[in-house]
Amino acid sequence: MKFASLTLTAAVSTCFVSVQGFSPAASFSARASSALQSTVEAPQERVAPGAGWEPEWEGREGKSPDEFLNSDMSRPDLSGMWECPLTRWDSEGIDVVKAQREAKKMPHCPLELKASPAMNAQGIDYFSKNKKKIRADLLKYGAIWLRGFDLMQDVNGFRDMHEALGLDPCLDPLHSSGLRKFASERDALYEEVNKPSLRGHYIGLHCESTAKRTAAYAAFVCFQRATEGGGRFIVADGAAILAEMDTKVLQKLYDRKIRISVSNLDIPPALPGFIKEGIKGAVDKAVAPKFDMDLEMIYESDGKPGRLQAVETAESPINRHPVTGLPVWFNNAHNHARKLRDRRPCGVPEVGMTEVFYADTMEPLSLEDCAEIKRASEKHITALPMEPGDVLLVDNYRALHGRDVFNGDRFHAVSWFTWDDNEEWRGEERRILEKNGLNKAINSMMDWLPKDFESNQS
């Protein structure tokens, strides 16, 4: 749910234009330990978080865009893919202390699977022959870094790989996202957040999930690394974060639950109440449903007079994995908490800023709780130096992902997958074509942003 905020805001603005497993390669980066300070003080220096592990780059070359995006038109068209499945919630009655003990037993995430010359020589056959083990390892480790494979350096080889593994593509949970256009629609491949206007925006850890819909798996592929540096892909184990977090903070968050606001619309506070309620009702009925999220429109939940926020329903920050039953940290607070976003590189305008609240009082998370989420999360980040052909397979109910800032041009892409072995969990919905027009319209709007757009929301 990384950019529900911008996409919802873009749609709102069209309606109300006149309103305003490998060895650690480096120790935990010092930049991650910068202290959080009070939000009422002067704006803080923006510092990109660090990581617990930072493997070295290898300097592998890839293909040109004309080559890596050249789809094989003789293959079946996958554009009528499955709808993203509904979120599998199983969060009641979790013993937090016991859950932390269980989580500590999990192996390091991600597992690195590095291609040898012999493995590369097999091409697609390697994945066909090793399908069972790779799928089992994905469940065990939460993510697998397929490193140095020649096969996945273009869209056709990438598709060969995930089809050999038996993965079944589905839509992004927020298909109407203005920052999620297709790289190759007929291959069910979305472009990742490569837009020049957002290269200076740090994307925090999150699952590709809303309270309503969650993809079961993902495969992130690098076709072109950032030409002028940066752009590491970050991943962390939800089990490791759960085990790491202070037990009292974790229990507090679990007991109180959280709610996430995904958009701000600032209405002049002096407007009469009936006008403000009319705006609220219009947004609720005409715009929010297009995003296939369960949202409530609430005024001034963050204390700002006149601010209308679109807020998701209450959700538990801990959820049991649908297949293994393992309780894991399953929420997007590291990405969406305002107190964290205000202190790192952020390319989101004020209207698109998110916030995380305690569900029982609708108060923003405290500075202390945000600091603990930051510490526990960033200690377990692996910042991957993904190069052409590299793929990160992700169990979306176990591992969280994000992206560091970068310079120059970069091209990563992603395919999302539904439950291929459980028809009930997958559901019977196919692609909702009505979403596509909104998707394209908002993409066009987002392309208007300057290449180095930077927010000034602090």
Predicted regions and their residues:
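N-terminal mitochondrial targeting presequences
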Residues: 21-22, 26-41, 45
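Non-heme Fe(II) oxygenase catalytic core, chiefly the N-lobe of the double-stranded beta-helix
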Residues: 43-141, 148-387, 400-424, 429-457
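N-terminal chloroplast transit peptides
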Residues: 2-27
